[in-house]
Structure formats: structure tokens, C-alpha cells
Amino acid sequence: QQARKQTAKISKSQRAPKLKKLQAIVLCPTRELAIQVADEIRNLSRYMHGIKVLPIYGGQDIVKQIRSLKSGTQIVIGTPGRVMDHMRRKTMKLDFVHTVVLDEADEMLNMGFREDIEFVLSGVPEERQTVLFSATMPKPIMEITKKFQNNAKVIKVTKKELTVPNIEQYYYDVKPKKKEEVLSRLLDIYSPRLSVVFCNTKKQVDLLVNALLGRGYFAAGLHGDMKQEQRDRVMQGFRTGKTEILVATDVAARGIDVDEVEAVF
């Protein structure tokens, strides 16, 4: 569902599927989300002959990315830093770009991507559609909309319920020193097939993973300091069930889409 909303906004590329030039750019805060969005676009465009989609992000072989861009990629989904890198290298031609999507714009700003975003938006043709998705609309977001959007339409989506009815939720007031023990007991009591544990920092992720492994659990960590190969290996293990507990920072976990997750801590 997260990825489908972007796809609807870049449907303009349908009007020129035979044009082997870059026509749409989607900026995402994380590699995982970029990959997820790219996969969904591929699924929805598989019956449209000639549409070529490419996710680009740091930690991936840039030579392969350049080769793919030269081969006629029409839709790029990438992290701001890597897209900006290609623009500076002049390996990404922007003359035919007519759509730019900023996904999770507030999160990208929280991660320090404001200058990168403005660099990208300043480099694409002025005659374009710029679409911005954001859970919140703080002042920095409004400044970007005023600077790079003309007569923008604001669409607010609200829900009467913030939670899904069939998900049970519990709150435990636990002292910091007791969190590891309580988590272990909850894992033993409920025995979820797959579970995700969120931590605030990368250090906390590493410490908790080591503690869980020491207790005999099949756990693995995911955070921004890991190389892409490591992240891919961790996610593959989690999807196949080899890893039962994924410990991650909130940013690193964005874009994770695994149906069998039964518990989130």
C-alpha cells in the first residue's frame, strides 16, 4: 500500500513508454523503501511493454547503476544522496523528467536530506509535476512546497482509527535494566514466528542482538552503519525465517514488508 501511492502519481510515464529517457524520479529516505517502491512499480507496469525501473542507493555498485541509466531507464527510485551523486557526475540526464515524487518528505528532512532534496529539485526541468508525501507538515516542509511547487493542491488523508482493529496492543512500564529480561519472557510466552524489535540507536541494536543471541534466540540487527550486502543478507534471513527476531532502528526498518511478522516490540 505504501508503494502503490507513488505508482499512481508517476503514471504520466505511460504517455511515452517508447521514449528511452528518464521521465520520473521518486526520492525515498531509505534503501529498503526505495527497493520496495521499485518492486511495486515493476509489478504494476509489467504489462506495459518498455517501462524500465531502477532503484539506486548508496552501497550499491555505481558502475552498474550508470550502465542501467544509459540503457534507457525511465523511472528512478532512489535515496537523495545517490541521486544527487549521479547528477553531479552527469550520469543521469534530466531533460525529459516530468514527474518528481518526494516520499516521506518529513523523514528525509529529519535525516538531514534537505540540501540534497533542494539540489535535485533545482536540477530537474521547471515544467514538471512535483508530488510530496508527508505524515506531518512542519515549517521546513512548507518552505519546500512554496519554493518548488506552483499552486499545489493539499490532500489530507485522515483515519477515524489510528490502529488496526484486529491487532492486540499492550503497554508495559519497565525499568531500562529490566527490558531485556521482559522482552525475553514475552518472546517465550507468545512464541511469535517472526518479530521486530525497534531500538533508538545503532548501539542499542548491536547490544540487544548480542544479548538475544546469548540467550539462544535467532536474532539479527539492521541499522544504517551496515553495508548493503549485510542488510540484504539480514533481510533475506528474516524473510525465509532463518532469523526469527529482527532488531532495527526506526529509520533502517522503513520499507520492510514481511507478511509473517506476528509481533512488534
Language-model segments: residues:
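Conserved helicase RecA-like core
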Residues: Q1-F265
